[in-house]
Protein backbone atom coordinates (compact mmCIF):
# COMPACT_ATOMS: atom_id res chain seq x y z
CA UNK A 1 0.00 0.00 0.00
CA UNK A 2 1.45 3.32 -1.00
CA UNK A 3 1.25 6.29 1.25
CA UNK A 4 1.81 9.81 0.18
CA UNK A 5 3.76 11.40 2.93
CA UNK A 6 5.44 14.75 3.83
CA UNK A 7 6.36 17.40 6.64
CA UNK A 8 6.83 20.87 7.77
CA UNK A 9 10.21 21.76 6.89
CA UNK A 10 9.46 25.10 5.29
CA UNK A 11 13.57 23.74 6.35
CA UNK A 12 15.01 22.72 6.12
CA UNK A 13 13.50 25.74 4.98
CA UNK A 14 13.01 28.95 4.06
CA UNK A 15 10.53 31.10 2.57
CA UNK A 16 11.13 34.45 1.19
CA UNK A 17 7.68 34.91 -0.08
CA UNK A 18 6.08 33.82 -3.28
CA UNK A 19 7.54 34.81 -6.59
CA UNK A 20 7.63 33.88 -10.21
CA UNK A 21 9.61 31.01 -11.67
CA UNK A 22 13.31 31.79 -12.16
CA UNK A 23 13.96 34.18 -15.04
CA UNK A 24 16.38 33.28 -17.79
CA UNK A 25 18.97 35.43 -16.03
CA UNK A 26 18.46 33.53 -12.77
CA UNK A 27 18.79 30.07 -14.26
CA UNK A 28 21.99 28.11 -13.95
CA UNK A 29 23.46 25.43 -16.18
CA UNK A 30 23.26 21.87 -14.86
CA UNK A 31 26.14 20.59 -16.98
CA UNK A 32 28.42 23.32 -15.71
CA UNK A 33 27.21 22.70 -12.18
CA UNK A 34 28.16 19.05 -12.47
CA UNK A 35 31.79 20.11 -12.74
CA UNK A 36 31.57 22.12 -9.52
CA UNK A 37 30.13 19.61 -7.06
CA UNK A 38 32.94 17.11 -6.57
CA UNK A 39 33.71 18.51 -3.11
CA UNK A 40 30.02 18.32 -2.19
CA UNK A 41 29.71 14.58 -2.83
CA UNK A 42 31.46 13.54 0.39
CA UNK A 43 28.47 14.72 2.42
CA UNK A 44 25.64 15.02 -0.08
CA UNK A 45 26.36 12.07 -2.37
CA UNK A 46 27.57 12.07 -5.97
CA UNK A 47 24.06 12.75 -7.30
CA UNK A 48 22.80 14.71 -4.31
CA UNK A 49 21.30 11.75 -2.45
CA UNK A 50 22.96 11.84 0.95
CA UNK A 51 24.03 8.53 2.48
CA UNK A 52 24.41 9.97 5.99
CA UNK A 53 21.28 10.99 7.84
CA UNK A 54 22.60 14.24 9.25
CA UNK A 55 23.44 15.62 5.79
CA UNK A 56 20.51 16.77 3.64
CA UNK A 57 19.77 15.21 0.29
CA UNK A 58 19.89 17.85 -2.42
CA UNK A 59 18.74 15.75 -5.38
CA UNK A 60 15.53 17.04 -6.92
CA UNK A 61 15.39 20.00 -4.56
CA UNK A 62 13.68 23.10 -5.95
CA UNK A 63 16.12 25.34 -7.80
CA UNK A 64 15.02 28.60 -6.22
CA UNK A 65 15.22 27.15 -2.71
CA UNK A 66 18.69 25.70 -3.31
CA UNK A 67 20.00 28.96 -4.71
CA UNK A 68 18.59 30.91 -1.78
CA UNK A 69 20.23 28.56 0.71
CA UNK A 70 23.61 28.68 -1.01
CA UNK A 71 23.52 32.45 -1.07
CA UNK A 72 22.60 32.56 2.61
CA UNK A 73 25.41 30.19 3.54
CA UNK A 74 27.97 32.13 1.52
CA UNK A 75 26.89 35.48 2.99
CA UNK A 76 26.82 34.14 6.55
CA UNK A 77 23.06 34.52 6.82
CA UNK A 78 22.79 30.83 7.54
CA UNK A 79 25.61 29.45 9.65
CA UNK A 80 26.62 25.84 9.05
CA UNK A 81 29.98 25.01 10.60
CA UNK A 82 30.72 22.23 8.13
CA UNK A 83 30.11 24.61 5.22
CA UNK A 84 32.51 27.28 6.48
CA UNK A 85 34.68 28.43 3.59
CA UNK A 86 33.24 25.92 1.14
CA UNK A 87 31.58 28.57 -1.02
CA UNK A 88 34.02 31.45 -0.57
CA UNK A 89 35.66 31.09 -3.98
CA UNK A 90 32.45 30.50 -5.91
CA UNK A 91 30.71 33.21 -7.92
CA UNK A 92 26.97 33.76 -7.90
CA UNK A 93 26.83 32.12 -11.32
CA UNK A 94 28.58 29.08 -9.83
CA UNK A 95 25.87 28.90 -7.17
CA UNK A 96 23.21 29.04 -9.88
CA UNK A 97 24.90 26.25 -11.82
CA UNK A 98 25.23 24.05 -8.73
CA UNK A 99 21.58 24.64 -7.89
CA UNK A 100 20.59 23.75 -11.44
CA UNK A 101 22.57 20.49 -11.30
CA UNK A 102 21.02 19.24 -8.08
CA UNK A 103 17.52 20.33 -9.05
CA UNK A 104 17.43 17.95 -12.03
CA UNK A 105 18.72 14.88 -10.18
CA UNK A 106 16.32 12.14 -9.09
CA UNK A 107 15.76 11.99 -5.34
CA UNK A 108 15.64 8.62 -3.58
CA UNK A 109 12.64 7.87 -1.35
CA UNK A 110 13.22 6.14 1.98
CA UNK A 111 11.08 4.05 4.31
CA UNK A 112 8.84 5.35 7.08
CA UNK A 113 9.25 3.76 10.50
CA UNK A 114 6.00 1.89 11.15
CA UNK A 115 5.60 3.13 14.71
CA UNK A 116 5.80 6.75 13.51
CA UNK A 117 3.60 6.43 10.44
CA UNK A 118 0.18 7.26 11.85
CA UNK A 119 1.24 10.27 13.91
CA UNK A 120 3.43 11.60 11.12
CA UNK A 121 0.69 11.24 8.54
CA UNK A 122 -1.89 12.88 10.79
CA UNK A 123 0.33 15.88 11.49
CA UNK A 124 1.40 16.26 7.90
CA UNK A 125 -2.05 16.15 6.37
CA UNK A 126 -4.20 17.53 9.17
CA UNK A 127 -1.89 19.35 11.57
CA UNK A 128 -2.94 19.62 15.22
CA UNK A 129 -5.81 22.04 15.74
CA UNK A 130 -5.59 21.92 19.52
CA UNK A 131 -1.99 23.12 19.43
CA UNK A 132 -2.45 25.46 16.50
CA UNK A 133 -0.20 23.45 14.18
CA UNK A 134 -1.25 23.75 10.51
CA UNK A 135 -1.06 20.93 8.00
CA UNK A 136 2.26 20.76 6.18
CA UNK A 137 0.52 20.30 2.83
CA UNK A 138 -0.31 24.01 2.59
CA UNK A 139 3.30 24.91 1.79
CA UNK A 140 4.93 21.58 0.95
CA UNK A 141 2.10 19.97 -1.10
CA UNK A 142 0.43 16.59 -0.45
CA UNK A 143 3.34 14.76 -2.07
CA UNK A 144 6.07 16.76 -0.38
CA UNK A 145 7.14 18.49 -3.58
CA UNK A 146 7.23 21.91 -1.99
CA UNK A 147 6.39 25.09 -3.87
CA UNK A 148 9.10 26.04 -6.33
CA UNK A 149 7.98 29.63 -7.11
CA UNK A 150 7.72 30.43 -3.39
CA UNK A 151 11.05 28.74 -2.62
CA UNK A 152 9.41 26.23 -0.26
CA UNK A 153 11.55 23.10 -0.25
CA UNK A 154 10.95 19.61 -1.52
CA UNK A 155 10.60 17.30 1.51
CA UNK A 156 9.96 14.00 -0.22
CA UNK A 157 12.75 11.55 0.65
CA UNK A 158 14.63 13.99 2.88
CA UNK A 159 16.90 12.48 5.52
CA UNK A 160 15.01 12.11 8.83
CA UNK A 161 17.97 13.02 11.04
CA UNK A 162 18.44 16.23 9.09
CA UNK A 163 14.74 17.14 9.27
CA UNK A 164 14.70 16.41 13.00
CA UNK A 165 17.66 18.73 13.58
CA UNK A 166 16.15 21.42 11.36
CA UNK A 167 12.85 21.41 13.24
CA UNK A 168 14.56 21.43 16.63
CA UNK A 169 16.77 24.31 15.50
CA UNK A 170 13.67 26.22 14.43
CA UNK A 171 12.04 25.44 17.75
CA UNK A 172 15.00 26.70 19.77
CA UNK A 173 15.43 29.77 17.58
CA UNK A 174 18.91 28.71 16.52
CA UNK A 175 17.76 28.70 12.92
CA UNK A 176 16.05 32.02 12.42
CA UNK A 177 17.86 34.35 10.02
CA UNK A 178 16.61 32.63 6.88
CA UNK A 179 12.89 33.00 7.59
CA UNK A 180 11.87 36.67 8.03
CA UNK A 181 8.23 35.75 8.64
CA UNK A 182 9.22 33.23 11.34
CA UNK A 183 6.59 30.76 10.12
CA UNK A 184 8.68 27.66 10.75
CA UNK A 185 9.79 28.92 14.15
CA UNK A 186 6.17 29.45 15.19
CA UNK A 187 5.18 25.98 13.99
CA UNK A 188 8.16 24.07 15.37
CA UNK A 189 7.75 25.76 18.78
CA UNK A 190 4.45 23.90 19.17
CA UNK A 191 5.87 20.47 18.33
CA UNK A 192 7.26 18.08 20.93
CA UNK A 193 10.14 15.69 20.26
CA UNK A 194 7.83 12.77 19.49
CA UNK A 195 5.93 14.79 16.89
CA UNK A 196 9.12 16.07 15.30
CA UNK A 197 10.52 12.56 14.99
CA UNK A 198 7.25 11.27 13.53
CA UNK A 199 7.17 14.00 10.90
CA UNK A 200 10.84 13.49 10.07
CA UNK A 201 10.30 9.79 9.48
CA UNK A 202 7.11 10.43 7.53
CA UNK A 203 8.68 12.84 5.06
CA UNK A 204 11.53 10.39 4.43
CA UNK A 205 9.04 8.04 2.80
CA UNK A 206 6.86 10.68 1.20
CA UNK A 207 6.19 10.36 -2.52
Say what each PLM segment does.
Residues 1-5:
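Positively charged n-region of N-terminal signal peptides that target proteins for export
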Residues 6-14:
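Bacterial N-terminal signal peptides
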Residues 19-37, 52-54, 104-130:
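Electrostatic cytochrome c docking/interface patches
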Residues 21, 28-76:
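The feature marks the first
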Residues 33, 40-47, 98, 133-143, ...:
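The canonical Cys-X-X-Cys-His
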Residues 34-38, 63, 127-137, 156-165, ...:
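Sequence context surrounding c-type heme c attachment/ligation sites in exported
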Residues 51-57, 73-115, 148-154, 172-197, ...:
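Axial heme c-ligation environment in periplasmic c-type cytochrome domains
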Residues 109-152, 160:
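Short, solvent-exposed interaction modules
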Amino acid sequence: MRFKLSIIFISSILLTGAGDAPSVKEKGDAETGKQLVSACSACHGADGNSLAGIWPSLAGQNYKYLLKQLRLVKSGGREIVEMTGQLDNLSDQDLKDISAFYSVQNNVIGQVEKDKLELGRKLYYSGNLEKGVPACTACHSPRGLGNAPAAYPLLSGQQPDYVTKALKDYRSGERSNEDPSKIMIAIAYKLDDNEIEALSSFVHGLH
